[in-house]
Amino acid sequence: MKKLFNFVFAFFVLVGICSANGQKMNIDYESKRNLYGDFVIIPMDNTVTVTDGCITIAPKSEDVTYTISGYFNGQIVNKTKNTVLKLKNVFIENNKGEAAIYGFAKTEISTSRGTENYIISTGSSDLKNAAIQCKKNLEMGGSGTAYVVGEVYHGVKGDDVKFKGSGVYYIQGTESGSTVNCHSFIAEKEKSFKLYMLNSKNGIKADNTIMIESGNFYSYNNGTAFKTDTLADNPAEKHGIFISNGSIRVHKNEKVFDTEEKFCKVRPKVIEE
């Protein structure tokens, strides 16, 4: 039944995307919330602080994994480098214009196999906030499914953003923002993840470079699928798009690549759908 639900949901999301330019992911938040029970975080010890609408995680050492599940309305904050947040059937939403998940230090988001996870950010803010946001580097991995909706500005935002693993990600920003906004974007070798970039000004927008060595990318209804700054924006930095492997499928994008022309090196064939 879980696999059937995944297929049906993905089918209707993609049909909606292909049928009308600018159509958003149609998620019935109310019915989805009801599918998720009480919020649970493991371990729940003195490294976890719970206040009204905020859960702060601050392990004393690096490389600690916290498994989270259930429903939470507010913000989850990580303060320690290399902390892993393992999503195991979780629905996190923030309706105050803030990130639903925020990292002060390098953070990894990992989805558990066979799980469906929702990270939603709504409301208004003068800041260009994302549903998942990290002040430092951010890694997205695992083998489950995540629906990330950033209705404030961006879907995902970090310094250097790396995708890995075999999971499926549906990420949506806004008509002014990006599905992924970062300094540099990296996709590791020999990974099979699927990244659906939906209904935003940009799919992946990097200040410097986009380097992709594997993965499956789907860009639907974005202004530009892959975009970096140029020498005109910042002459002191290297800018370019380098895609050596993986797959790229696009539908209703105004432009696929936007970077320094001599530094746009793409090996896989771009498939128009």
Regions found by a protein language model. Give the residues of each.
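Sec-dependent signal peptide recognition
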Residues: 2-10
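Hydrophobic h-region of N-terminal signal peptides that target proteins for export
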Residues: 11-19
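A composition-driven surface/loop motif
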Residues: 21-273
